Amino acid sequence: MSLIDPRAIIDPTAVLADNVEVGPWSIIGPGVEIGEGTVVGPHVVLKGPTRIGKHNRIYQFSSVGEDTPDLKYKGEETRLVIGDHNVIREGVTIHRGTVQDRAETTLGDHNLIMAYAHIGHDSVIGNHVILVNNTALAGHVHVDDWAILSGFTLVHQFCHIGAHSFSGMGTAIGKDVPAFVTVFGNPAEARSMNFEGMRRRGFSEEAIHALRRAYKTVYRQGLTIGQALADLAEPAAQFPEVAVFLQSIQTSTRGIIR
């Protein structure tokens, strides 16, 4: 039995691997490539150039690979690249890149993009990321591995969301979020670290304790960023997790949420 519903509209130049399933009324345009085992539900629109990897699942009414609404976009050829084992729930929108940046929007592996979330042009999403319902990322946003953005989180363009970080519901993020940090509010403020997430992912208690001390150095001792980073050099040499936290602050271009 065919896995392609006869009511789907698929451009003859689209490339679908073995065992790709396409539901009724979905539209797959030219320049779309879909890896094996991926399931495209009903009423989905896929626009190219877009490459989708293996064993993804895209739910109804999602729009994936559409042109960016950026006013600088003049129809140049840009891309969307999606990895493997992602779940893209109902009504999600993901836009391709712009030539003013990398000309590519990227979604890694094992991500959960929940209903009505938006991923803007040129954004880079790592692996094991969760975007909860109605989270919206503006253009050029980077989200590192294992970050969780709770429902209705808004992220300003060019922000960097660090690995293992967490945002509370309705948070408005306008600066970079360091790795492991938990932020809440509008505007966002740092509240703590994502200790529960660390424990669930098997971090040692020694590493968690070192990160707790590092957080206090940056956020609770009244130091400048330069002073805090200098104090973190020694623990960063001992604990790779602290080094990740330190690097996420050092490489910030928008300044960090404090």
Curated annotation (Swiss-Prot):
Alphabetical GO biological process terms: lipid A biosynthetic process
Origin superkingdom: Bacteria
Keywords, in A-Z order: Acyltransferase, Cytoplasm, Lipid A biosynthesis, Lipid biosynthesis, Lipid metabolism, Repeat, Transferase
Catalytic activity field: a (3R)-hydroxyacyl-[ACP] + UDP-N-acetyl-alpha-D-glucosamine = a UDP-3-O-[(3R)-3-hydroxyacyl]-N-acetyl-alpha-D-glucosamine + holo-[ACP]
Gene Ontology terms, MF aspect: acyl-[acyl-carrier-protein]-UDP-N-acetylglucosamine O-acyltransferase activity
An example Gene Ontology CC term for this record: membrane
Compartments, as annotated in UniProt: Cytoplasm
CDD domains linked: LbH_UDP-GlcNAc_AT
E.C. no: 2.3.1.129
Top-level EC class: transferase
Membrane-spanning ranges: none
PANTHER family per record: ACYL-[ACYL-CARRIER-PROTEIN]--UDP-N-ACETYLGLUCOSAMINE O-ACYLTRANSFERASE (PTHR43480), ACYL-[ACYL-CARRIER-PROTEIN]--UDP-N-ACETYLGLUCOSAMINE O-ACYLTRANSFERASE, MITOCHONDRIAL-RELATED (PTHR43480:SF1)
Function: Involved in the biosynthesis of lipid A, a phosphorylated glycolipid that anchors the lipopolysaccharide to the outer membrane of the cell.
Protein family (similarity comment): Belongs to the transferase hexapeptide repeat family. LpxA subfamily.
Subunit: Homotrimer.
Official protein name in the record: Acyl-[acyl-carrier-protein]--UDP-N-acetylglucosamine O-acyltransferase
Organism: Pseudomonas syringae pv. syringae (strain B728a)
